[in-house]
Amino acid sequence: MEYPRSEVVINRMATTEITSQNHDQSVADGIVLLDFWADWCGPCHMFAPVFEGASEKHSDITFGKVDTEAEQDLAASYGVQSIPTLVAYRDGIPLFSQAGALPAEAVEDLIGQLRALDMTEIRAEYEKQKAAAEGR
């Protein structure tokens, strides 16, 4: 007897919407890539499949999308003046920011570099810079 084939569809959201409310928690741990975009932005639509593809390939990384129209204050806090803008964090430390639609190879290269970082050194330098900025 042949049974009808059932198809199971797993709805896995590969990217996360980042808002002012979930931003700090979202960038706190691990590697995080943020894509600042807007619906009216042509280059943003060209970059979207690259970003989505990387998110599906690297499930251990948080891929967040920031709608600059809905989250104007958040975009302003990053100084975003051109979109798309890609921002990278590791363990809560901002490490990279670049405007423009990057090709897939550049995104993969960035991910490789983020994975290879010695975070002990990075944390020490980050704390030193933070203390200097606060006048300590």
Feature-to-residue mapping (PLM):
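CheY-like receiver
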Residues: 119-136
